[in-house]
Amino acid sequence: VRLIRLIPFNMMFVRLSSSYFFYFALLGLISPYLAIFLDGQGFNSRQVGEILAIMTATKIVAPSLWATFADKSARPLFIIRLGALLALVSFSLLYWFSQYWPITFCLALFTLFWTAILPQLEVHTLTSTKQSSKIYARIRLWGSLGFIVLAVVAGETISRLDYQVFTSLGVIILAGLFISTLLLTPKKGGKLNKGKTNAPEPIVNKLIDGRFISFFIAGLLLQISFAPYYGFFALFLRDFDYSGVAVGLFIALGAVAEIIAFIYMGSLFKRFTLNSLLVFSLAITALRWFLMPVVADSGLWLAINQLSHAASFAIYHSASMKFISSHFTKSQQSRGQGVYLGGVYGVGGAVGAYITGLLWLGGEGASNAFIMAGTSALLGAIIMVFSKK
């Protein structure tokens, strides 16, 4: 009953939710199973880590470039649609290549265009919902649902068929994403004054603010910590003889916990400060990674550990978006999102993926990789504890 009340059926909600659904459905395919695909191509752990690092490194600059273009053009929906279309085209190139450098190029090109979508979609959603944390969380949970569906479906499909079905699944999802972006409509009265779009408000003072610097570094460390999970978790579970559907269910369980957290984010924002939510998320994440190699051989304890994804992702992500929304002015939102996603997800993800690739050693160094991850998240928590309130 509560879930039914939480889903307002109006066209704005449906359009935004469908875009989030397909965007994160693709993440539900790529995050767990790209390593399976690359492993099937014959690449070793170091090569897999390098490819993941190169893909993620494109996020360092690309989001800011796309965001600046969006701010100056005042056409965020055009950026979203263009990114979705070009991501579809570039991902489709995987059908024709099987060697290391061509595949690396295709995936890097795909990521370059894919990064154009989420920052603008977040800004468009926050603008359309008038900065309502509750409505945003309800829309965003459909992204989690998309992730769950693909994590389970792809795990079983790849297990039953072949790792090469990965490409076809990605193309289908990206086609759905592109179609969903065509259904998005601009907010009424939301067009910017064209006479002012050529001189966007500077954001340097916002970027050098001590509170933002602490927030940025903590986010960077969190993303470094996620690298073993995002890039190698499916391979990790496969080494413990879990089936394809079991791998998908473990990943989906984390996303279910994430959805529940998103539902209650409005209440959490009323009861706790942003800083306390960020510290809590980082601390729980550190514990999660430290426990991962310890509980991996027990399905029950691994499932319990996966529930902490509610804090690791949902609470931290929602708090981060609220921080960015309040820290930057309306005209700075796209660039603020771009700097955050480019620096935190780009640098953090790339560094984490590269280090994990070096530590993994075909699975023999998995424990060391998760210890590195836990230490990184713990450092992030300490930074936020001493951050300026």
Regions from the language model: what does each represent?
Residues 3-9, 185-219:
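Juxtamembrane intracellular "pre-TM" segments in multi-pass secondary transporters
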Residues 9-56, 211-250:
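Helix-loop boundary and gating motifs at the non-cytosolic
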Residues 21, 90, 100-117, 220, ...:
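Hydrophobic core of transmembrane alpha-helices in multi-pass small-molecule transporters
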Residues 62-75, 158, 261-273, 360-361:
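Helix-to-loop junctions at the C-terminal end of transmembrane segments
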Residues 78-92, 276-291:
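Structural signature of the two symmetry-related core transmembrane helices
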Residues 95, 176-186, 371-389:
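Multi-pass alpha-helical transporter architecture, strongest
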Residues 108-142:
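Cytoplasmic helix-loop-helix junction between adjacent transmembrane helices
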Residues 156-173, 358-377:
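A membrane-interface helix-boundary motif in multi-pass transporters
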